[in-house]
C-alpha cells in the first residue's frame, strides 16, 4: 500500500484474552438468540434440534469464524486493509472489504431501532408502566410504540449516541471495558432469571418441551426442515460475512490458536441461546401461553406473562435489562468495525470517526423508524412487510452468506490467500489445532452448504 501523509493511527490491541472473548461473544450474542433459537428448537423436536444445531455449529460456524479471525489477525486491519495485505498482486478480493463496511452499516440501520425497543421496555417495566394493565392493554403498548416515530426515534438515537460514545474512549478503555461489564452482568441476569423460571409451576413441562429429544415432533415438522433450520441458526448466530468478527481478529495476539478462540466464542453464544429457552419456556408453560417467535414473543407474550406473575415488575425489568445488554453489546461491537474502517479509509482520529459515524447511522436509521408509521405504505417485500424487513433481508439473506462464502474461498483456494497460509495462521499459538484432514470439508462441502443457504434465502 502507498504511504499517506497522514497515516492511520497505530493499531490498538485487547488488554486481555478475556476481553477479546467477551467482546467477540457480545458481537455474536443478540436478539436472535432469544426471539428465534428457543422457539425454533421447541417446535423442531427440542433436543433433536439442539443436537443438529451443535453439529452444524462445529462443522460450519467454527471453521468460518476461524477464517474471518485469521484474515484480521494476519492482515492487521479491517477487511479492506487485511485483504490488500494478504491477496496476490492485482487481485480484487479487497473489494469485499467495502461490501463488509456496507453490511455493517446496513445492519445498524435497523438493529439500533430494535435495540431501542429493548431499552424502551426496560424503562417501561422499571417505571411501572405495565402495572395493573389487562392483557389487551399490555399487547397494545407495542403497537402504540410502533405508531410513534418520536418514541422510537428517541430510543434509537439514544442507542446510537451511547454506542459511539463508548467507542470514542478507545478499544481498551471503551469497547473492552464496557462490554466486559455488560457481559458479566448479562451472565448474572441469566442465572437469576433462569433460577426464578425453575421455581414456576410449569417449569418441568417447559424444560421437557425445550430440551428433551422428541423425534415425533421432529418428524411432524419434517426432518429435512429441522436440519435446514438447525443449519441456518448455526450459520447466522455468529453474524459472519460482514467483517464484524474480522476486526477483533486484527486486535488479537498470536498466543492462542483461532480454533480454540472460536470454540469458546461459540460456546458463550450457545450458552446464552439455551439459557434464553430455560427462562422463556417454563414461564410460558406456567401461564398457558404459546411461545411465539420474533418480536411478538418479546414484546407481547412475555410482558403479559410478567404482568401476571408475582413480582412481575421486577422480573420484567431484569429480563429487558438482559435484552438491552444482549442487543447493545452487538451494537458497540459493530460500531467499532465502522469506526476502525473510517479511521483506516479516511486517515482520521477515533473521536472524529465516532462523530461522523454517529451522524451517518442516525440519519440512515430514520427510514426503519418511519417504516412502521409515516412510511408504512412502503412494503418492500410485499403486503405487510416493513423497511426493517427489507433491510434485514438484504443483510441476513444476501450479505451474510455471500460474505461468508467470500471469506471461505479466499482462505481455502489458490486464487486467494491459500489453504496452507490460512491453516498456519489458524494454528499459530497454543490450543486446539485445525487438522489438515479437514481440507475436503472446507474446500468442497462448506461452499456447497453456504450456496444452499443463499439459494434457500432467495426462494
Enumerate the language-model features and the residues they cover.
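Membrane-interface "cap" regions at the ends of multi-pass membrane proteins
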Residues: 1-35, 64-69, 73-95, 253-257, ...
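Inter-helical loop and helix-membrane interface segments of multi-pass membrane transporters/permeases
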Residues: 8-11, 40-44, 74-99, 112-172, ...
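Helix-loop-helix connectors at the membrane interface of multi-pass transporters/channels
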Residues: 2, 7, 81, 115-147, ...
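C-terminal membrane-solvent junction of multi-pass transporters and transport-like membrane proteins
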Residues: 95-96, 101, 346-358, 390-450
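Membrane-embedded translocation segments of transport machinery
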Residues: 2-3, 7-10, 14, 176, ...
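Transmembrane helix-boundary motif of multi-pass solute transporters/channels
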Residues: 18-56, 205, 243-249, 259-263, ...
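Membrane-water interface regions at transmembrane-helix termini and the short interhelical loops
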Residues: 40-44, 92-108, 143-145, 158-182, ...
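Loop-to-transmembrane helix boundary motifs in multi-pass membrane proteins
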Residues: 13, 19-21, 153-154, 268-274, ...
Amino acid at each position: 500500500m502507498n504511504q499517506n501523509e497522514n497515516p492511520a493511527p497505530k493499531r490498538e490491541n485487547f488488554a486481555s484474552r478475556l476481553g477479546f472473548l467477551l467482546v467477540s461473544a457480545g458481537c455474536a450474542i443478540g436478539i436472535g438468540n432469544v426471539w428465534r433459537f428457543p422457539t425454533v428448537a421447541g417446535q423442531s423436536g427440542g433436543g433433536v434440534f439442539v443436537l443438529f444445531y451443535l453439529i452444524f455449529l462445529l462443522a460450519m460456524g467454527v471453521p468460518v469464524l476461524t477464517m474471518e479471525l485469521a484474515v484480521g489477525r494476519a492482515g492487521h486491519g479491517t477487511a479492506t486493509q487485511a485483504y490488500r495485505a494478504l491477496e496476490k498482486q492485482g487481485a480484487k478480493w479487497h473489494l469485499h472489504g467495502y461490501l463488509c463496511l456496507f453490511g455493517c452499516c446496513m445492519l445498524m440501520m435497523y438493529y439500533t431501532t430494535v435495540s431501542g425497543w429493548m431499552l424502551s421496555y426496560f424503562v417501561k417495566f422499571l417505571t411501572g408502566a405495565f402495572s395493573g394493565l389487562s392483557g389487551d392493554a399490555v399487547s397494545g403498548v407495542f403497537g402504540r410504540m410502533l405508531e410513534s416515530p418520536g418514541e422510537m426515534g428517541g430510543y434509537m438515537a439514544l442507542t446510537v449516541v451511547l454506542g459511539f460514545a463508548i467507542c470514542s474512549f478507545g478499544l481498551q478503555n471503551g469497547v473492552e471495558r464496557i462490554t466486559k461489564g455488560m457481559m458479566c452482568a448479562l451472565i448474572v441476569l441469566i442465572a437469576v432469571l433462569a433460577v426464578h423460571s425453575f421455581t414456576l409451576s410449569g417449569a418441568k413441562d417447559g424444560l421437557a418441551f425445550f430440551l428433551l429429544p422428541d423425534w415425533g415432533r421432529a418428524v411432524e415438522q419434517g426432518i429435512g426442515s429441522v436440519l435446514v433450520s438447525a443449519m441456518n441458526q448455526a450459520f447466522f448466530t455468529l453474524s459472519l460475512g460482514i467483517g464484524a468478527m474480522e476486526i477483533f481478529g486484527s486486535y488479537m495476539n498470536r498466543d492462542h490458536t483461532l480454533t480454540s478462540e472460536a470454540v469458546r466464542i461459540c460456546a458463550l453464544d450457545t450458552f446464552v441461546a439455551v439459557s434464553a429457552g430455560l427462562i422463556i419456556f417454563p414461564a410460558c408453560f406456567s401461564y398457558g401461553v404459546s411461545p411465539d417467535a420474533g418480536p411478538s414473543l418479546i414484546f407481547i407474550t412475555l410482558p403479559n406473562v410478567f404482568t401476571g406473575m408475582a413480582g412481575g415488575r421486577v422480573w420484567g425489568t431484569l429480563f429487558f435489562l438482559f435484552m438491552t445488554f444482549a442487543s447493545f453489546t452487538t451494537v458497540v461491537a459493530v460500531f467499532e468495525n465502522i469506526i476502525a474502517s473510517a479511521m483506516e479509509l479516511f486517515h482520521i482520529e477515533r473521536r472524529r470517526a465516532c462523530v461522523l459515524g454517529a451522524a451517518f447511522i442516525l440519519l440512515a436509521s430514520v427510514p426503519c423508524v418511519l417504516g412502521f408509521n409515516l412510511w408504512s405504505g412502503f412494503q418492500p417485500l410485499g403486503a405487510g412487510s416493513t423497511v426493517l424487513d427489507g433491510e434485514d433481508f438484504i443483510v441476513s439473506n444476501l450479505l451474510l452468506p455471500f460474505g461468508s462464502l467470500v471469506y471461505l474461498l479466499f482462505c481455502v483456494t489458490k486464487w486467494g490467500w491459500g489453504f496452507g497460509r490460512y491453516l498456519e495462521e489458524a494454528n499459530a499459538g497454543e490450543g486446539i489445532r485445525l487438522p489438515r484432514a479437514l481440507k475436503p470439508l472446507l474446500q468442497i462441502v462448506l461452499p456447497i452448504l453456504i450456496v444452499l443457504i443463499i439459494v434457500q434465502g432467495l426462494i
